[in-house]
């Protein structure tokens, strides 16, 4: 299966040894994404603004890989203060209201920079490529494809 790595050009990708996203077959995995750009942290102190910026950033890498937000099947949201879940959820809902991917929102003690309040990972599947799923196993569990 072919693998394609996507880079944002951030210096940390080479230092830490990771890619912004990796496409293998029909599956794209997007690395943990925070609200930062070339000027620094976006939306300091604002969970909603950071979440919205992060999802816009994720949408860009999805587009680079030939996917769209509608192809997202899973999101993982890591937040430094779960009491702000409604702000994070509101921004997430603006992007995924009609898509409704599987999701998790998890409180963590800290992110790599104290100004980062939210980090999001995404899994997306290209629907135009036939999946390599073993359909016979799905029938065994009475799962409809």
Regions found by a protein language model. Name each.
Residues 1-145:
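Short, polar/acidic, helix-capping and beta-turn segments at strand->helix junctions
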């Amino acid at each position: 299966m072919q693998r394609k790595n996507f880079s944002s050009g951030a210096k940390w990708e080479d230092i830490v040894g990771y890619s912004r996203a990796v496409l293998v077959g029909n599956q794209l995995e997007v690395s943990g994404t925070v609200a930062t750009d070339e000027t620094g942290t976006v939306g300091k102190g604002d969970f909603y603004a950071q979440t919205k910026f992060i999802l816009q950033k994720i949408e860009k890498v999805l587009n680079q890989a030939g996917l769209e937000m509608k192809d997202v099947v899973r999101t993982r949201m890591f937040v430094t203060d779960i009491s702000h879940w409604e702000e994070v959820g509101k921004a997430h809902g603006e992007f995924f209201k009609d898509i409704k991917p599987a999701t998790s929102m998890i409180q963590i003690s800290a992110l790599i920079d104290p100004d980062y309040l939210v980090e999001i990972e995404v899994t997306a599947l290209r629907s135009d490529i036939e999946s390599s799923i073993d359909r016979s196993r799905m029938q065994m569990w009475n799962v409809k494809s």
